[in-house]
């Protein structure tokens, strides 16, 4: 996993509450286990019309929001079933940071495990953040837990364990591999039955 320290990018805004994983990526696209190729199905039923043409009224389709790597959204983002395909679709689309009023627990952990930073931020702060010009680069500094725009500085908090994993680009496997020698030594000492 790529370390996450400071990210600069533009933001897309989708301030709906209770966006569930089936709205993030509908179930018909979950037939693969590769982590890539899901971005084109992100928010599929909202992004496209019945002819698979982009819906011009959907916020992510706005020309000035294309290429955004920060998503600002409502409360309880990622609720519903605990499919890991939802964070895969967000990451494959290009999002590195998701700022919401809250997240479903499993979705929150799956974001972290896939190198995305989910940030919990109250509504008043998010409303200030969404007023940022669509072309402005927003800086997200994980190490100092600060989001900076040209007019505001917002502080956020993150659990130390998750922060360290993201800062160092570590997932469960890479953490386990840090103890490879100890594991081999243990296996050598323990009798086989």
From Swiss-Prot:
GO BP term, pick one: L-leucine biosynthetic process
GO cellular component terms attached to this protein's record: 3-isopropylmalate dehydratase complex
Uppermost EC category: lyase
Pathway: Amino-acid biosynthesis; L-leucine biosynthesis; L-leucine from 3-methyl-2-oxobutanoate: step 2/4
Documented EC number(s): 4.2.1.33
InterPro entries: 3-IsopropMal_deHydase_ssu (IPR004431), Aconitase/3IPM_dehydase_swvl (IPR015928), AconitaseA/IPMdHydase_ssu_swvl (IPR000573), IPMI_Swivel (IPR033940), LeuD (IPR050075)
Superkingdom: Bacteria
Catalysed reactions, as listed in the record: (2R,3S)-3-isopropylmalate = (2S)-2-isopropylmalate
Keywords: Amino-acid biosynthesis, Branched-chain amino acid biosynthesis, Leucine biosynthesis, Lyase
GO molecular function: 3-isopropylmalate dehydratase activity
Subunit structure: Heterodimer of LeuC and LeuD.
UniProt family annotation: Belongs to the LeuD family. LeuD type 1 subfamily.
Function (record text): Catalyzes the isomerization between 2-isopropylmalate and 3-isopropylmalate, via the formation of 2-isopropylmaleate.
Protein's UniProt name: 3-isopropylmalate dehydratase small subunit
